[in-house]
Amino acid sequence: DAIVDSSARPVLYSVFQQKQDAASYRALLGEAAGKIRAARTIMDSSNTANDRAALARRALTPDERLDNRVETAAAIRLLNEASSTLMDMAGSSGFAESSLAQQYWRDFNVGSRHVIFNAYVSNEAFGTSVLGRAQEILPADCV
């Protein structure tokens, strides 16, 4: 919202009286919004699978848990890219301590680096599964 709200401001040192008049600004906004939407779609799908298992009173299978891990890693990657793009659009003022955009960006970047979201391990485990190899990367209760 902060980015959209600032779209009426000028692009300094350019001919654009409003940021939204610049095609590059609109393209970046569209790219970031598309990544946020894709991440939401991924997580909605993952949550639906979790809800179905819970309603059936069954634990997720190892394959379903791997799906959750790799899909969450993909969603986090998309959101990380989107938040970085939005901060680029906000410019240096977006990083002011008083800026909500900076606070959200910082909190997301710290939280997304929690060990449970380790994309490298999740992607390696999923790749191992795709190859049909024995799962030796994650303990069974962590898959």
Regions found by a protein language model. Give the residues of each.
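Extended amphipathic alpha-helical segments enriched in small hydrophobics
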Residues: 1-52
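Generic non-transmembrane alpha-helical segments
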Residues: 2, 78-85
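Generic detector of well-ordered alpha-helical segments enriched in charged/polar residues
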Residues: 4, 26, 47, 65, ...
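Charge-rich, acidic-biased intrinsically disordered regions
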Residues: 15-21, 52-69, 94-110, 138-139
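Alpha-helical structural motif
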Residues: 25-28, 35, 42, 71, ...
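Generic structural signal for well-ordered, non-transmembrane alpha-helical segments
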Residues: 30-37, 69, 73-80, 106-109, ...
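C-terminal helix-coil-helix/basic helical segment that borders enzyme active sites and/or dimer interfaces
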Residues: 38-74, 84-95
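Glycine-rich phosphate/cofactor-binding loops in nucleotide/flavin-utilizing enzymes
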Residues: 92-143
